[in-house]
């Protein structure tokens, strides 16, 4: 059971110094004055930017209670809990406080949502992926863990990782082993599901400190990106050999990485420049593909069954497609506009699915490839709409696995079959 947040813990944070000065030092906003302000700043700023509070869509007191319950356990301090909830409900109610409203697009397709709440509070659950036995692996980035959830039994097992790993993702190799990227300690590793033991490789390049996204070839060779370090890496787990190359253009911020359908070429997204990177897995030689819109940055990409490379234009608020054979590029504006910041993406059953993380609520969008039309849905987490989808994956059953980081949720999205529409 999670331990209650007691008064001394909050007092220790407050004793560090002026919370307002601390917020200004970190470039965080000053929240409205009132009873409860210091408690909110103390508890919230330790895990996330305070800006997320005024940037939310606003909630009732009961919704704030539910949302905070996924982050911290205040049951042992009811007076403090009431003070926090009263402050949040009074200053950030639903409706008129939403600074970033979404623009939903109605349509005929119906979805069924299955929500699974992971165990450790405040872990920032992300990047769920289905294993061969139907279980779901996920990364708890802020909890410094990866976990396995069995939808059939409801049982969860979470595996603590080496200190300061802060896993940015979890990925399964051809043997079904769960790998993680040590995003804050410069490591790549995998966990034995039976013993919980982690096998870890430290990056030999002292500047390659932030392994990000992982993929594998059919032989189990590991390929991965470094966003801040501006690098791409390869690990042979059998020999331990690691090769790391630097992207020529500074601040490209290589982010997502996936093989094409033939398994012969790697595609990498650039999160700070208008480009995609084509990578030779044998040599790690990089060829840059320029994207047309100057404000373009790309969080993630996916490869369609026909080999097309689909990507989210996070910087300009769009969806794009690259034909790798002809070089033709086409883009569409996302429904919620240029600041909608599309993020995760997956191609499924004639549609491209992605989310609009820059608006509230976070919207799940489907683009129909044949008709070039959109439909979108707010992503709900329990009785609140809160969090960001950072990666999307497909199950063997043809459903979509997504998540909401703020509420420790893995969500299975089941689209209605076309014939039933």
Where are these regions (language model features)?
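Conserved beta-strand positions in repeat-built beta-propeller and related beta-rich domains
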Residues: 137-142, 178-184, 222-228, 266-272, ...
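Beta-strand-rich domains and repeat architectures in extracellular enzymes and scaffolds
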Residues: 114-145
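The canonical Cys-X-X-Cys-His
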Residues: 40-51, 84, 88
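Blade-level signature of beta-propeller repeat domains, shared across WD40, Kelch, NHL, RCC1
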Residues: 385-421
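Electrostatic cytochrome c docking/interface patches
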Residues: 21-39
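C-terminal capping alpha-helices of c-type cytochrome domains
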Residues: 74-101, 352, 400
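Beta-rich, blade/repeat-based domains predominating
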Residues: 121-133, 163-175, 206-219, 249-264, ...
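Short loop/turn segments that connect beta-strands within beta-propeller blades
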Residues: 150-154, 192-196, 236-240, 280-284, ...
């Amino acid at each position: 059971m999670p331990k209650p947040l007691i008064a001394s813990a909050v007092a220790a944070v407050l004793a560090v110094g002026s919370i307002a000065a601390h917020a200004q030092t970190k470039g965080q906003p000053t929240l409205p004055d009132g009873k409860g302000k210091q408690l909110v700043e103390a508890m919230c700023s330790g895990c996330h930017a305070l800006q997320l509070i005024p940037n939310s869509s606003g909630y009732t007191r009961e919704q704030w209670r539910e949302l905070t319950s996924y982050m911290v356990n205040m049951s042992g301090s009811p007076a403090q809990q009431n003070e926090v909830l009263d402050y949040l409900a009074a200053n950030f109610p639903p409706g008129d406080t939403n600074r970033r409203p979404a623009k939903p697009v109605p349509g005929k397709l119906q979805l069924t949502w299955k929500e699974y709440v992971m165990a450790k509070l405040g872990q920032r659950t992300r990047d769920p992926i289905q294993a061969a036995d139907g279980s779901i692996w996920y990364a708890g980035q802020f909890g410094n863990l990866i976990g396995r959830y069995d939808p059939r039994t409801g049982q969860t097992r979470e595996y603590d990782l080496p200190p300061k790993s802060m896993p940015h993702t979890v990925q399964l190799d051809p043997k079904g082993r769960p790998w993680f990227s040590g995003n804050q300690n410069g490591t790549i590793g995998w966990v034995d599901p039976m013993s919980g033991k982690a096998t870890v490789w430290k990056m030999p390049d002292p500047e390659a400190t932030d392994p990000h996204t992982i993929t594998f070839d059919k032989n189990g060779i590991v390929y991965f990106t470094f966003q801040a370090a501006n690098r791409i890496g390869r690990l042979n787990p059998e020999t331990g050999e690691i090769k790391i190359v630097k992207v020529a253009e500074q601040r490209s911020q290589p982010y997502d990485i996936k093989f094409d359908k033939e398994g012969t070429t790697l595609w990498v997204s650039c999160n700070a420049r208008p480009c995609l990177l084509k990578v030779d897995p044998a040599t790690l030689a990089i060829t840059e593909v320029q994207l047309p819109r100057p404000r373009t940055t790309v969080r993630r990409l996916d490869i369609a069954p026909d080999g097309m490379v689909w990507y989210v234009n996070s910087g300009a608020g769009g969806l794009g497609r690259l034909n790798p054979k002809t070089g033709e590029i086409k883009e569409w504006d996302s429904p919620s506009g240029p600041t909608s910041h599309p993020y995760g993406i997956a191609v499924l059953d004639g549609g491209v699915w992605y989310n609009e993380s820059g608006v509230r609520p976070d919207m799940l969008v489907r683009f129909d490839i044949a008709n070039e039309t959109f439909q979108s849905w707010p992503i709900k987490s329990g009785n609140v709409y809160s969090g960001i989808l950072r990666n999307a994956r497909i199950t063997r059953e043809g459903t979509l696995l997504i998540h909401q980081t703020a509420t420790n949720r893995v969500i299975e999205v089941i689209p209605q079959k076309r014939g039933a529409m």
